[in-house]
A protein has these predicted regions:
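Non-catalytic terminal/linker segments enriched in charged/polar, low-complexity residues
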Residues: 1-123, 127-130, 138-139, 166
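P-loop/Walker A NTP-binding module and the surrounding RecA-like catalytic core of P-loop NTPases
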Residues: 122-342
């Protein structure tokens, strides 16, 4: 009787029910994040299956059947690493460090040896595990994409645009590969698919002029990220490499900091030749990062270690499939784990 007409007391935010509800919401978010990470790793693992078959499966065949670890075994390991495109410099470092551990009797059995080997591989990659951070100011953040024909440069631009869009950034593309009409059309197709504006001129136009126009447009429209394509050039052709220098000069006249990133796209299927390309490009223009494509189609994914050891350039992205979201930010530990995952 006396309770009629009284308002119900608001729920105490500190009550057990309120706390339980908040906890459930938090757990749902955490579970979704864990599931997403698990999915990403599964795709990375699947994309690296051919390299894993050559590298880790081959190593396991050599090591796991042995009762003792000795110098003769290390010679077999050295041969296996070289055949997996790890490269001479990286392989020498790995073997030298394993020999030191062997002398200190720290590699008593195959399991310890494989753990030590994985750590050596991770140690080579960790210094180049440097993500590309898009600075919010000044705008636009300019990424200049370079590389030889056929490495997947234009496709990588489309995938990068989608990645940055998913992060809530405004993106514009510059069709700076004016030598091939197909390249301009391909970039415009990527732009249309993702609703990203593309600045382009006629085939044969001056590439530096196209990128200059794109920069001016992006700046006026307050665009967050401008990704500029360039002509696929042979690293042995001086005239094309000189054109790349011109593009950089034109950008620096607008702002000395530009370009913010010079990203070299390399095809993993070329193995050690990718290293030669990177060295040549780095002489012409100062590279700030690498993107390694087509890892899903090759057993030569060991070249990542060769690049890391020889050049010490950040590996920004790796391509592990043909889907639009198969260009992934590079993570050293995940890469090694995927190579040795069963």
């Amino acid at each position: 009787m006396f309770g009629l007409g009284k308002k119900k007391k608001p729920e105490d935010p500190n009550s057990n029910e309120a706390l339980e509800g908040e906890s459930n919401r938090s757990n749902s978010v955490n579970d979704a994040a864990i599931q997403d990470e698990s999915s990403l790793f599964a795709r990375l693992k699947n994309g690296l299956s051919r390299t894993r078959s050559r590298l880790s499966d081959g190593l396991a065949e050599i090591v796991l059947g042995e009762k003792t670890i000795d110098l003769d075994l290390l010679e077999e390991i050295e041969t296996q690493l070289l055949s997996a495109d790890i490269g001479i410099d990286a392989t020498d470092q790995i073997i030298d460090n394993l020999k030191k551990q062997l002398r200190r009797k720290q590699l008593a059995d195959p399991k310890q040896f494989m753990t030590a080997l994985r750590q050596e591989l991770t140690d080579i990659l960790e210094p180049v595990d440097v993500p590309l951070i898009i600075q919010s100011e000044p705008k636009p953040f300019v990424i200049l994409m370079v590389g030889v024909n056929g490495v997947g440069k234009t496709t990588s631009i489309g995938k990068l645009a989608k990645l940055y869009q998913s992060q809530g950034l405004n993106v514009m593309l510059a069709a700076g590969d004016t030598f091939r009409a197909a390249a301009v059309e391909q970039l415009q197709e990527w732009g249309a698919r993702n609703s990203v504006p593309v600045v382009a001129q006629a085939t044969g136009a001056d590439s530096a002029s196209v990128i200059f126009d794109a920069y001016q447009s992006a700046k006026a429209k307050n665009v967050d990220v401008l990704i500029a394509d360039t002509a696929g050039r042979l690293h042995t052709k001086d005239n094309l490499m000189n054109e790349l220098e011109k593009i950089v000069r034109v950008l620096k006249k607008q702002d000395e900091r530009l370009p913010d990133e010079v990203l070299l796209v390399l095809d993993a299927t070329t193995g050690q030749n990718a290293l030669n390309q990177a060295e040549s490009f780095n002489k012409t223009t100062t590279l700030s990062g690498l993107a390694l494509t087509k890892l899903d189609g090759t057993a030569k994914g060991g070249v990542v270690f060769a690049l890391a050891k020889k050049l010490s350039l950040p590996i920004r992205f790796i391509g592990v499939g043909e889907k639009i979201d198969d260009l992934k930010p590079f993570k050293a530990k995940d890469y090694v784990d995927a190579l040795f995952s069963e």
